[in-house]
Amino acid sequence: MNQNRVVPDVTVVVGAYEAMPYLVRCLESVESQTLGPDRIEIVAVNDGSTDGTGEYLEEFAARSKVATRVIHQANSGGPSGPRNVGLRMARGRYVFFLDADDFFGDEALERLVAMADRAGTDVVLGRLKGVGRKVGSSMFARTEERVDVHSSRVVFALSAQKLFRRELLSRLGLEFDETLPTGEDSLFTMEAYLRGNGVSVVADYDCYHLVARDDGKHATRRGSYPPRFQALTALTELIVRLEPPGPKRDQLLVRPFTVGLLQQFGPHLLKESEEVRRHKLELAAPMVRYWSRGVADRIKVGERLVLACVAAGRLDILADVLEFVRTKQVPEVVTGDRRGRIFLAYPHFGDRRSGIPRSAYQVTVPDWSGSRRIMPTVTLPSLARRAVGRARRDLRRLGVRRPRRRRVKLDNG
């Protein structure tokens, strides 16, 4: 084992549980880094494996040119514990959390470190590539030295597989929440985004390969929904705590509502018992306290309507909306509103007794009605509309008429 006394550029933290044979390729990808073995260290935590993972880690550490420390511990029940152990032992300027099932592209760390050094940012995202699975791509449209967390798509990339500046993590005392059985990486990454000195994106190279295991291990069971609500509520409360009220907070809150809560109330809810439906509604209550018009107007009508039903506690209307979606019906486009607004007539549109506001059906972001693209109309803000209305009424009371429009011929001579 090469124990390099020089401070490495990167500490790669590998938490490993029943990781064979995927661990072999994972560690080989660290050895293959163009950054060079003298600039990398590995801290590998064997989390109570019984499949030979621990033995392979020791064998690797004994022969590898990359300085490697191996820790063996009893199974902790999740990824947070091993990651925290590795983070506490890290010596590198940067830390990268590499899952034992996955692997790096050869140039990944060299490119990520170069970006962080050049831009001075505390978090760097490297482009993901799925192996036997789909991965998000919208946040990797282009390489950028600095992105705005509030307006960019990086807020939809909250997994832990990123380069983090260790000084930031140490200063904040930032660790993974070991009380959360799922979603712990979302809180960790979001806090680093919001409290760090900027976020960069490396989008021109496949830095990280996310692997779908053939044996299906490590997959979260669909039925275990209470922990998901716990994680979503924690993420929502973190955003509210760190971001003051206003448009920026509203934009951030779109993430837990659409990538999280919405999935718990999808069409599959129709197959679940009344008891489960009501239980989910109860679990959503702490989170929907932060549902607001500012958040709602940033979401498409179909998704917003589901969330509005949850916020209003209307499981009956929600069932009608989900059946409408499940059967692939197309909402009618309703125009002619005196304010120029456009609506999509999903179930219960125009029903004043429903408790669902008419605004829930309004097109406020680019949307779809079947194959037809629907663009929102641009209207004056409510305060401006009121001011214009008052001014017009005052003019009418004074007997002032609006001037007629006249065509004026310009003399170009």
Please tell me what each predicted stretch does.
Residues 1-234, 350, 354-356, 360-370, ...:
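Nucleotide-sugar donor-binding/catalytic module of glycosyltransferases
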Residues 26, 30, 60, 383-386, ...:
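Low-complexity, intrinsically disordered/propeptide-like segments
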Residues 66, 77, 156, 379-380, ...:
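A general, composition-driven signal for non-globular sequence regions
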